[in-house]
């Protein structure tokens, strides 16, 4: 939708326009970081357009909170590292931006894995590459680097991220398959696909593409076969907060 102060955004289109430090693109995951990026914008001695992606689902999210101290001290964090894990125990680093972080965080708490670090990219452009590479050096035992996004593979930030990091780390994507439209058109299909992304990040999926680059080809766009599978599992109303918990989709 569109209103007096906002419009629906296509992240990949804004990122295509980024060059020569012409604009700033941010996707904040905490109230304090949102506050500080606005504060920084006004405080700076120069003016460059600031694009901020702010999904409505985080407005009242129980995990999306900041303390008063977070507002009154510090500044905008271009990258937020995972402080809940021991770097030497991590063998997989997942990079992401935006609200999908909270879905992965919820699953990470359930799994209590301890071997997966989730790093949030809060500023997409200018991309803080040196800062990110410095953070990644902490994870010396990590060989698997993932970019996780809920958008289709040809949308979102994936292609932008890949072009920046491909020469430095071997990174692969977990996302929806490439699509001509940003939405599936089916709420059931959307929820299953969303959970499938989380399952693949935490290796709960036994798809043969699990250890390869995943663009959810195991589901694809096979609407009829998908609807039949839903009927086989007697799935009528799907709770987005629950796992699909069924046989792997084919």
Regions found by a protein language model. Name each.
Residues 1-44:
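Conserved thiamine diphosphate
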Residues 25-29, 52-54, 147:
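General beta-strand structural signal in soluble alpha/beta enzymes
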Residues 1-10, 44-47, 59-248:
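Thiamine diphosphate
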Residues 15-19, 55-56, 109-114:
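Generic detector of short, locally flexible boundary/turn motifs and exposed helical patches
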Residues 31-33, 56-58, 99:
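Short acidic/polar capping segments at secondary-structure boundaries
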């Amino acid at each position: 939708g569109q209103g007096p102060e906002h419009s629906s955004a296509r992240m990949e289109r804004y990122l295509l326009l980024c060059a020569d430090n012409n604009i700033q693109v941010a996707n904040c995951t905490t109230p304090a970081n949102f506050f500080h990026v606005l504060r920084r914008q006004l405080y700076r001695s120069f003016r460059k357009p600031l694009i901020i992606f702010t999904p409505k689902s985080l407005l009242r999210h129980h995990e999306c909170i900041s303390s008063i101290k977070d507002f009154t001290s510090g500044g905008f964090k271009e990258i937020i590292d995972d402080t809940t894990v021991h770097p030497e125990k991590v063998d997989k680093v997942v990079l992401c931006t935006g609200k999908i972080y909270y879905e992965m965080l919820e699953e990470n708490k359930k799994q209590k894995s301890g071997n997966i670090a989730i790093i949030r990219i809060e500023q997409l452009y200018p991309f803080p590459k040196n800062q990110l590479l410095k953070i990644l050096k902490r994870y010396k035992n990590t060989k698997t680097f993932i970019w996780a996004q809920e958008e289709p593979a040809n949308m979102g930030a994936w292609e932008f991220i890949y072009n920046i990091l491909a020469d430095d780390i071997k990174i692969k994507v977990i996302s929806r398959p490439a699509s001509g439209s940003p939405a599936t058109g089916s709420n059931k299909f959307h929820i299953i696909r969303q959970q499938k992304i989380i399952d693949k990040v935490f290796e709960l999926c036994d798809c043969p593409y699990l250890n390869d680059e995943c663009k959810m080809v195991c589901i694809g766009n096979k609407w009829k076969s998908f609807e039949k599978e839903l009927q086989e599992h007697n799935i009528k109303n799907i709770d987005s907060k629950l796992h699909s918990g069924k046989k792997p989709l084919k």
